[in-house]
């Protein structure tokens, strides 16, 4: 699902974009554990935006981890409907929802 989106970006807005994944980079992602660092996010406003049907990232692990953050100022935004991980980037309606959520968060917390 990612290749058509990045191919379109390269053809239309980012001609110098190169999108490479290596076996090593995938292995690093799969081994990464954020848990030891979560306790440091105490007084930091934190926003997490996901799609309801994310088929690329592991939201079944990410959302519970987000919920364990000790900061009282956090917000989880899940874009519903038919939103997928990549549609948050290439579907104008989904992108507007993400942009609005992020702009509101920045207005309130920066």
Q: How should these model regions be labeled?
A:
Residues 69-86:
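Catalytic histidine neighborhood in serine/cysteine hydrolases
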Residues 1-37, 47:
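Alpha/beta-hydrolase
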Residues 30-33, 50, 55-61:
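Conserved alpha/beta-hydrolase "acid-adjacent" motif
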